[in-house]
Amino acid sequence: MNPEYDYLFKLLLIGDSGVGKSCLLLRFADDTYTESYISTIGVDFKIRTIELDGKTIKLQIWDTAGQERFRTITSSYYRGAHGIIVVYDVTDQESFNNVKQWLHEIDRYACENVNKLLVGNKSDLTAKRVVSTDAAKEFAESLGIEFLETSAKNAANVEKAFMMMAAQIKKRMANAPVAPKAGVKLTPGQQVPSNGGSKCC
């Protein structure tokens, strides 16, 4: 076990271009915000270590490009992700409509039991809002995933979103059956789980 942390969780931020994924990451990792918008090219990542239930958790957070032309690059980053945060812009109906497509990408590329969180960003732009909180909440509930609205600009719920995701993953890890180690007796007919395939986390 690495003495610096108890857990290392890989998180992924996905969603349409311009919804504020990079801003959310900057706010959480560095507590900074910039109005100037530069599209992420391919992927970028930052690391932040948090404390949760007396455990030290290192979060490796990957920020992916939302543009279609980067899909083939970013799809490989789904593998091995413990948690995926799907971000849309509350002032952009199309970005919310496209959440279904992003969830399809998760089903296609990510681990079967990966944790998911739906985040509606830019909640500070109340006058420009087009996606209601209730509609998004209802949609998330129908899929059985958690939902939060955030504002990277004023830091509303940003910390909460990442902490919620970390707590979900930690809970899943704690409840997951431990693979048999060498010397452990297996019941007749029981197979040792392999580490191969896409069911990786």
UniProtKB/Swiss-Prot annotation:
Task: Name where it's found.
Answer: Endoplasmic reticulum membrane; Golgi apparatus membrane; Cytoplasm; Preautophagosomal structure membrane
Under InterPro entries, the record lists: P-loop_NTPase, Rab, Small_GTP-bd, Small_GTPase
Q: Where is this motif: Effector region?
A: 37-45
Q: Which UniProt keywords apply?
A: Autophagy, Cytoplasm, Endoplasmic reticulum, Golgi apparatus, GTP-binding, Lipoprotein, Membrane, Nucleotide-binding, Prenylation, Protein transport, Transport
- Which residue numbers carry lipidation of type S-geranylgeranyl cysteine? C200, C201
Give the GO cellular component terms, alphabetically: endoplasmic reticulum membrane; Golgi membrane; phagophore assembly site membrane
How the protein is activated or inhibited is described as: Rab activation is generally mediated by a guanine exchange factor (GEF), while inactivation through hydrolysis of bound GTP is catalyzed by a GTPase activating protein (GAP).
Coarse class of the primary localization is: endoplasmic reticulum
Tell me which Gene Ontology terms the entry assigns under biological process. Answer: autophagy; protein transport
NCBIfam families per the UniProt record, alphabetical: small_GTP (TIGR00231)
Q: In its UniProt entry, what is this protein called? A: Ras-like GTP-binding protein YPT1
Gene encoding it? YPT1
